[in-house]
Amino acid sequence: MKVSYHGHSVVKIETNGKVILIDPFLTGNPKTDLKAEDVNVDAILLSHGHGDHVGDTVELAKKNNAVVVAPFELATFLSWQGVNTHPMHIGGSHEFDFGKVKFTQAFHGSSYIDEENKTITYTGMPAGILFTAEEKTLYHAGDTALFSDMKLIGELNNIDVAFLPIGDNFTMGPEDAVLAAKWVQAKTVVPMHYNTFPVIEQDPYQFVEKLQNCTGKVLEAGESITL
């Protein structure tokens, strides 16, 4: 399984001849190396409904006839826009032809904000994502605060790599993320959701230096690891 990072919370997985994107915020993302028009994808996994995570989902899904796996309310909202969706909910898992997906708890919000009409549409509960293929497991925490049940996620799953937000303000900051890394017990931890906007500026190298009992890895946009 090849896993690459593409800025903010965008993660690409290549496995079993399939390409999966998590939270494909490409257009308007100053930290990504990807352009939506150049991306080919078989499946899209969404953690929640905020614009910096849903991103280019509708365009990518329609262009590639890709399935969008998302929390139930968000999946329903996107299906009304003509997207092929597979709704799930926290605690549920499903075996797809590209791998197994399970949604975990996350402490955050989830909504679609229409700035022009000044409306906010509820899109369900936010989630973290466990993805398993080729006997390897990736944990994408989504946007979240630190929460004690991360210990349970670590106890129940043999996590090879975890992507954890460190930006603070909207999610946990570096200090809490260090504790999260300890609790989820991943072999490798990669920071995400930082430096996209001034309010979430952080030094990822300082973060990985503080990690214990795991390998910390800073990935620049386009860099990858192989599990």
Swiss-Prot record:
Classification via InterPro entries: Metallo-B-lactamas, RibonucZ/Hydroxyglut_hydro, UPF0173, UPF0173_UPF0282_UlaG_hydrolase
Pfam name, any one: Lactamase_B_2
Entry keyword Coiled coil: no
GO MF annotations, alphabetized: hydrolase activity
TM stretches of this protein: none
Keyword annotations from UniProtKB, A to Z: Hydrolase
Family to which this protein belongs: Belongs to the UPF0173 family.
Protein name per Swiss-Prot or TrEMBL: UPF0173 metal-dependent hydrolase BCE33L4354
Provenance organism: Bacillus cereus (strain ZK / E33L)
